[in-house]
Regions:
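Alpha-helical transmembrane segments with an aromatic anchor "belt"
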Residues: 102-175
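Cytoplasmic membrane-interface regions of multi-pass membrane proteins
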Residues: 54-70, 136-147, 203-204
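Membrane-interface segments at loop-to-transmembrane junctions
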Residues: 71-78, 146-155, 213-219
Length: 237
């Protein structure tokens, strides 16, 4: 029966109906929510551009010197400026992370592509909230308020440096037809390097007031635990 339908008078009969066209996923930068978020990021950076430029000298000093973070915290206006810039940079960081596919757990398939960046921002805010809770629950003793603020905000310094480097780097690589997997690897490497530097600086701050074992325990509870929770959710969920 089947052969009779396929072959008639010694010829292969094929349907003349056109094959259905498969829709390809929309380009990341063509999704409307991403366009809006990109424009918002640019507007925020332009609005605070003067503050960002003023922050460069104390930020570089804080990154270069072991006690540079303390001097930045003593400068109240610079510290507030740093915190504001770190908050502003959260949006472009999440946009780059989503563009590179840096966070893709199993349940991410349920997230519509147009809301993937917003979901990534939610994960980032959850990380900051968990880190804040860790600092509220685990307070190292024998530390002044200024020293604790230096420890808590040290990550912000490296986060700002990371975004300042990652934005132009990830923006330029596609112009040279670099593969997406390589771009993602570069972003993950930059992020890991920035977190490693921030962890080392936190170690130095804690070690100056603690013996090695308590330093390791505090470091794990305050910095490594929140980051490990994000990595574990990406791998296990």
């Amino acid at each position: 029966m089947l052969d009779g339908e396929l072959f008639r008078q010694g010829r292969l009969e094929m349907s003349s109906a056109p094959l259905p066209e498969f829709q390809t996923p929309a380009e990341w930068n063509n999704l409307l929510p991403n366009k809006i978020a990109i424009v918002l990021s640019v507007v925020l950076v332009l609005v605070y551009l003067k503050d960002i430029i003023r922050l460069i000298p104390p930020l570089l000093y804080a990154l270069d010197r072991k006690r540079g973070g303390e001097s930045l915290e003593y400068n109240v206006s610079a510290a507030r400026m740093r915190n504001t810039v770190a908050l502003i940079y959260t949006l472009p960081f999440c946009l780059i992370a989503d563009y590179c596919g840096a966070y893709r757990p199993g349940f991410w398939s349920m997230v519509p592509p147009e809301w993937s960046s917003a979901a990534t921002l939610g994960v980032m805010l959850a990380y900051f909230l968990l880190r804040r809770l860790c600092y509220a629950a685990i307070r190292p003793g024998k530390m002044s308020a200024e020293s604790l603020a230096t420890l808590k905000h040290s990550l912000y310094n490296y986060f700002i440096a990371l975004v300042s480097v990652a934005v132009p780097t990830i923006g330029i690589l596609p112009l040279f037809s670099v593969r997406e997997d390589i771009i993602s690897t570069v972003f993950l490497a930059l992020t890991g390097l920035a977190f490693a530097f921030a962890t080392v600086r936190a170690w130095q701050i804690l070690k100056s007031r603690r013996s090695p074992l308590p330093t390791i325990l505090y470091l794990c509870g305050l910095e490594i635990l929140p980051a490990a929770a994000v990595v574990a959710s990406a791998v296990l969920l």
